[in-house]
């Protein structure tokens, strides 16, 4: 059973993961409007950055319409109660970028690594703690690690100073049992004072269900986004999660009607590619592929006259992970040569 008295930390990711859905092209006016609506609806934190984190704007990942710091400052200017979060991937963002994000208004940082590479996060986690930031370890592609292995990686991040460890279903490839096993393993090894979080993707339509199961196993923080705005088929849709949680009597602290209105009136009209489960986004969950590969794979498929589905499935077979976007072209050329 889920503790109905426990306050769930609602972490919105519309302005970070949602960047993938608009090719990192949110205007400053758009981020301010979305953030204001989220703040008024009662979310606890609002993550702001390029889809691939601080300094993700690049040829490899896609150029942003603005800098991370401009987006963060635009949000900081309008929010009254929610804390601003940001994402940092070691090797893309640096501690200098983190300081700039802090100066712009960010007070939570999620330091993200592949689920086998927690050791590269030490410098960034320690520096974030020295700034007094709420510091989170974010283990991407968690389906590619065993529950025990993932827990060991989480313990490493905790030892560096992380105050919360996230199970991150970047591929939207896990089911409820997968989530339960990973949270049980985490709770077995982490200090009771260390929180845990869930970041779902909706590629198998399990984003909300997986988030609820995470709560059943002691999860403290839940990521979600308006309309599910995010990579692939998106994240757990925030307005849906909040409605489901309310029907279960859970303490999420948000105004469901305000979330629904913000989703429909502000965010959904911005989707140039509808965020939903379809042939291509289902391929991500089916093959266990990093969700942000979607738009890159679609571009490669269009360029070479191939099926996006086939490219994504082959990427899954090769166990490609975040940061290997350049391999999408290699896979496309291999498929082309195979006829």
UniProtKB/Swiss-Prot annotation:
Binding site for Mn(2+): 17, 199, 201
Name assigned to this protein: 4-hydroxy-2-oxovalerate aldolase 2
Keyword Membrane among UniProt keywords: no
Residue ranges occupied by any Pyruvate carboxyltransferase domain in the UniProt entry: 8-260
Annotated PROSITE patterns: PYR_CT (PS50991)
GO function terms (MF aspect): 2-isopropylmalate synthase activity; 4-hydroxy-2-oxovalerate aldolase activity; manganese ion binding
EC code: 4.1.3.39
UniProt binding sites for substrate: 16-17, 170, 199, 290
Sorted UniProt keywords: Aromatic hydrocarbons catabolism, Lyase, Manganese, Metal-binding
Chemical reaction(s) catalysed: (S)-4-hydroxy-2-oxopentanoate = acetaldehyde + pyruvate
């Amino acid at each position: 059973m889920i503790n109905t008295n426990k306050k769930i930390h609602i972490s919105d990711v519309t302005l970070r993961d949602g960047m993938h859905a608009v090719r990192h092209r949110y205007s400053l006016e758009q981020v301010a409007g979305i953030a204001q609506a989220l703040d008024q609806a009662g979310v606890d934190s609002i993550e702001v950055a390029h889809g691939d984190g601080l300094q993700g704007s690049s040829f490899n990942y896609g150029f942003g319409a603005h800098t991370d710091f401009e987006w963060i400052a635009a949000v900081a200017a309008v929010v009254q109660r929610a804390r601003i979060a940001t994402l940092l991937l070691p090797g893309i963002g640096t501690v200098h970028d983190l300081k700039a994000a802090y100066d712009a208004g960010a007070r939570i940082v999620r330091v993200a690594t592949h689920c086998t590479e927690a050791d590269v996060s030490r410098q960034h986690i320690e520096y974030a703690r020295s700034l007094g930031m709420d510091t989170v370890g974010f283990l991407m592609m968690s389906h590619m690690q065993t529950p025990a292995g993932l827990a060991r990686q989480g313990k490493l991040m905790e030892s560096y100073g992380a105050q919360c460890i996230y199970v991150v279903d970047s591929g939207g490839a896990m089911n409820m049992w997968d989530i339960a096993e990973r949270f049980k393993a985490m709770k077995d090894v982490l200090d009771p004072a260390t929180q845990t979080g869930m970041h779902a993707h909706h590629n198998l339509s399990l984003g909300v269900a997986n988030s609820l199961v995470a709560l059943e196993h002691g999860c403290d923080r839940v990521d979600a986004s308006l309309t599910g705005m995010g990579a692939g088929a998106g994240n757990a849709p925030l307005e849906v999660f909040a409605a489901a949680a309310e029907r279960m009597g859970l303490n999420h602290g948000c105004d469901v009607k305000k979330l629904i209105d913000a989703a429909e009136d502000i965010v959904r009209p911005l989707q140039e590619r509808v965020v939903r489960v379809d042939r291509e986004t289902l391929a991500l969950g089916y093959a266990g592929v990093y969700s942000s590969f979607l738009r890159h794979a679609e571009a490669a498929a269009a360029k070479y006259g191939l099926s996006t589905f086939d490219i994504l499935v082959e990427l899954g077979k090769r166990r490609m992970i975040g940061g290997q976007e350049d391999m999408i072209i290699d896979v496309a050329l291999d498929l082309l040569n195979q006829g």
